[in-house]
Amino acid sequence: MSYISSLREVIGNRPIISVGATILVINQKQEVLMQFRSDTLDWGLPGGSMELGETLEEVAARELEEETGLLAEHFELIQVFSGSDGYFKYPNGDETYGVIHLYQAKGVHGALVMEDGESLALEYFSKENLPKKIEKRAQTLLDALGDRCFEREHSF
């Protein structure tokens, strides 16, 4: 059982502070990898919460592999988001204030695979073709980066 799940058994839906990593993967066409999420039924960026004893880079590596099947040689920290930018209420009522560490995956290899049940689809999107229904936290990150998001060196 994950740390967050075991915590939720004790405190229920009350707001928590969670620390996690969100991963930006950019292909050679300057498109950003997004996942259609099974929990919120909208598009987001791969990522998740830290487990006890993990480093943030380990969180990024684990979540990238679990949610996309991709592996990365290393991760570059882009920015940290917190406060109201990290607030989210899940459809089940769970509330969280995330301390979100946005990383770009570097030296990415492997094939896109959905095995964890969290992703219903994985797709790369250009700046001009972003999906209409983007999850709040992902939209906040994309808005904060603006054009810089799509001007970064690719991840492969």
Residue ranges and their predicted role:
Residues L71-F81:
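A short coil-to-beta-strand element that immediately follows conserved catalytic motifs
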Residues F81-A111:
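Active-site-adjacent beta-strand/loop module that shapes the phosphate/pyrophosphate-binding cleft
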Residues L41-D42, L112-F156:
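Nudix hydrolase/Nudix homology domain
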